[in-house]
Curated annotation (Swiss-Prot):
Organism encoding this protein: Prochlorococcus marinus (strain AS9601)
GO biological process: chlorophyll biosynthetic process; protoporphyrinogen IX biosynthetic process
Subunit structure of this chain's protein: Homodimer.
Name of the protein described by the UniProt record: Glutamate-1-semialdehyde 2,1-aminomutase
HAMAP family cross-referenced by the UniProt entry: HemL_aminotrans_3
CDD domains referenced in this protein's UniProt entry, alphabetically: OAT_like
EC number(s) recorded for this UniProt protein: 5.4.3.8
Length: 433
């Protein structure tokens, strides 16, 4: 494959950005800290492709970190947005589009009987934690090592995503009193969760988790794990919360809870439901959601919540996803991609394990299986950094971190998958010891 060697404009722009923004970026993982080198600066995106400011084209497997499941700048989405923007960018008042997207979410997601729109996944998780505590009258919450629920103080305990990428223990500026009620357990370890419940009787408001971990790499639940959490929370009068910001509408139309047949009490959403615009949502049983203001006493608000542009993009995206055969195609191309990646590594004598669920995939450069964050950390991060550079040179844009899942879209064709597997084969050959 043709090598990309010219990053002159990207380097100039990023150099200037470092004087203007912390680390030169608006979100830490974009800075390429864990893979080395300087980040490329994007100019435009379309379908499965991204172009940098130097004119280089890449096959993109980040998809704006998950929202672009229909492909970048899908014509039906952009046309709908062009029509909507003529009516205004934000109302700060109720609009009919909120009703329509709410109905679509409620119809699709098994746990959701009522929904509140916010502006990000972090906001959704912050609000849902407050709601968990208010509904149960309990302060403690259980999360899992490596699971990421946004950058709110109470969740920055053994968190994944950028915290894992940068090797940070947690974050300075978070008082111990803020996280004192946040308990942690290894993912896929039911016994550890049972122990926390026994040590904290009648004190745990609930358990929150990514049903498929995507912010500590790609880790799937062991058989019986989600079912076991459902039983434990019910037995202890606690709530079960699925953070489906990443998995919602990506691994099936009804998310992970539909895919695995386990229904939580509350769900957080984001990414896909905004079609590429800033959005978040949380929802669940009516008796719980009725506690949210103004119906109830649990306060939460947002200036741009439910704005017409995000609602428009979300509605059109979900309409596209609901078409026949959508998830069959995503299953097919993504499983073929990860099988090709694994085969390429094995052909070159490189330890690897990985997998996929519909339009979400990931791999670790280590012997497997990987069932939790501790095992994920055995991944060869240095080798991944070399792989990332080789793939970038060959026009393949992977997440610049070994602790992030990858994403496919409806715009990725067999041709893009073939080229990507070829690039992996060449890159593994280039970095093998």
């Amino acid at each position: 494959m043709t090598d990309i060697l010219n990053y002159t404009k990207s380097e100039e722009i990023f150099s200037a950005a470092q004087q203007l923004m912390p680390g030169g970026v608006s979100s830490p993982v974009r800075a390429f800290k864990s893979v080395g080198g300087q980040p490329i600066v994007f100019d435009r995106v379309k379908g499965p492709f991204a172009w940098d400011i130097d004119g280089n084209r890449y096959i993109d497997y980040i998809g704006s970190w998950g929202p672009a499941i229909c492909g970048h700048a899908h014509p039906e989405v952009t046309t709908a947005l062009q029509e909507a923007i003529e009516k205004g960018t934000s109302f700060g008042a109720p609009c009919v589009l909120e009703n329509k997207l709410a109905e679509m979410v409620i119809d699709a997601v098994p746990s959701v009987e009522m929904v509140r729109f916010v502006n990000s996944g972090t906001e959704a998780c912050m609000a849902v934690l407050r709601l968990m505590r208010a509904f149960t009258g309990r302060d403690k919450v259980i999360k899992f090592d490596g699971c990421y629920h946004g950058h709110a103080d109470m969740f920055l305990v053994k968190a994944g995503s950028g915290v894992a990428t940068l090797g940070l223990p947690d974050s300075p500026g978070v008082p111990r009193t803020t996280t004192a009620n946040t308990l942690t357990a290894p993912y896929n370890d039911l016994e550890a969760v049972k122990k926390l419940f026994s040590e904290n009787p009648d004190a745990i408001s609930g358990v929150i988790l990514e049903p498929i971990v995507g912010n500590a790499g790609f880790i799937t639940p062991e058989p019986g794990f989600l079912e076991g959490l459902r039983e434990l929370t019910t037995e202890n009068g606690s709530l079960l919360v699925f953070d489906e910001v990443m998995t919602g509408f990506r691994i099936s139309y009804g998310g992970a809870q539909e895919k695995f047949g386990v229904t939580p009490d509350l769900t957080t959403l984001g990414k896909v439901i905004g079609g590429g615009l800033p959005v978040g949502a949380y929802g669940g049983k009516k008796e719980i959601m009725s506690m949210v203001a103004p119906s109830g006493p649990v306060y939460q608000a947002g200036t741009l919540s439910g704005n017409p542009l995000a609602m428009t993009a979300g509605i059109k995206t979900l309409e596209l996803l609901k078409q026949d055969g959508t998830y069959d195609k995503l299953d097919l191309i993504t499983s073929r991609l990860i099988e090709g990646i694994i085969q390429s590594a094995e052909n070159n004598g490189i330890a690897i394990n990985g997998g996929s669920v519909s339009a979400m995939f990931g791999f670790f450069l280590c012997d497997g299986p990987v069932r939790n964050f501790n095992e994920a950390k055995t991944n060869d991060a240095e080798l991944f950094g070399k792989l990332h550079k080789e793939m970038l040179r060959r026009g393949i844009y992977l997440a610049p971190s070994p602790f992030e899942a990858g994403f496919t879209s409806l715009a990725h064709s067999e041709e893009e998958i073939d080229k990507t597997i070829e690039a992996f084969d060449e890159s593994f050959n280039a970095i093998k010891k």
